[in-house]
């Protein structure tokens, strides 16, 4: 799933990819053009250009025909955008967890016990009498009765990814 913003970014990435590598401006990108582009960018170092072109070609040219279809380029750009979103969510989740543990982890064991978790539960705007045990069970993946830093990080990451998906276009 992607958002409207993701789609326009991916479209721009596709246009940039074609602009960067379509040397003869025929709106078609070939493995030869990829190699020539890298050769120019790497000041004539044919070994490095060959290696870089090989990696990119093996990643993008799914049918190994030496040509990059619009579908292949768009899939590559969409995959790159997805990886970036996931990396950003992971980094932000880590920062969220560190801030949360600094504030709520009174015994400094890098996990929240039930008392600490109920405080977190209240801060999130949940009614503490509704069912903190239910939410604890959802976040507590290993079911040890504590919410560890890694469990919190995964939970925050999934919430951020869900938010990043936003409305579907």
Swiss-Prot record:
GO MF terms held by the record: calcium ion binding
Domain EF-hand residue range list: 9-44, 60-83, 92-127, 133-162
Binding positions (Ca(2+) 1): 105, 107, 109, 111, 116
Any single Pfam family the record assigns to this protein: EF-hand_7
GO cellular component: cytosol; extracellular matrix
Keywords on record: Calcium, Metal-binding, Repeat
Keyword Metal-binding annotated: yes
UniProt-annotated binding residues for Ca(2+) 2: 140, 142, 144, 146, 151
InterPro entries attached to this UniProt entry: EF-hand-dom_pair, EF_Hand_1_Ca_BS, EF_hand_dom
Gene3D superfamilies, per database record: EF-hand
SMART domains: EFh
Name of the protein in its database record: Calcium-binding protein G
Species: Dictyostelium discoideum
Lineage of producing organism: Eukaryota, Amoebozoa, Evosea, Eumycetozoa, Dictyostelia
Gene assigned in the entry: cbpG
């Amino acid at each position: 799933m992607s958002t409207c913003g993701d789609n326009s970014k991916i479209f721009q990435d596709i246009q940039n990819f074609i602009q960067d590598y379509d040397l003869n401006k025929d709106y078609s990108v070939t493995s030869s053009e990829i190699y020539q582009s890298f050769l120019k960018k790497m000041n004539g170092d044919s070994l490095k250009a060959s290696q870089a072109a090989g990696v990119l070609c093996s990643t993008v040219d799914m049918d190994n025909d030496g040509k990059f279809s619009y579908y292949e380029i768009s899939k590559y750009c969409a995959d790159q955008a997805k990886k970036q979103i996931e990396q950003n969510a992971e980094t932000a989740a880590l920062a969220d967890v560190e801030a949360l543990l600094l504030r709520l982890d009174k015994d400094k064991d890098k996990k929240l016990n039930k008392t600490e978790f109920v405080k977190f539960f209240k801060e999130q705007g949940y009614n503490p009498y509704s069912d903190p045990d239910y939410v604890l069970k959802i976040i507590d993946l290993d079911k040890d009765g504590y919410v560890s830093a890694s469990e919190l990080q995964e939970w925050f990451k999934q919430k951020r990814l869900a938010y990043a998906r936003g409305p579907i276009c």
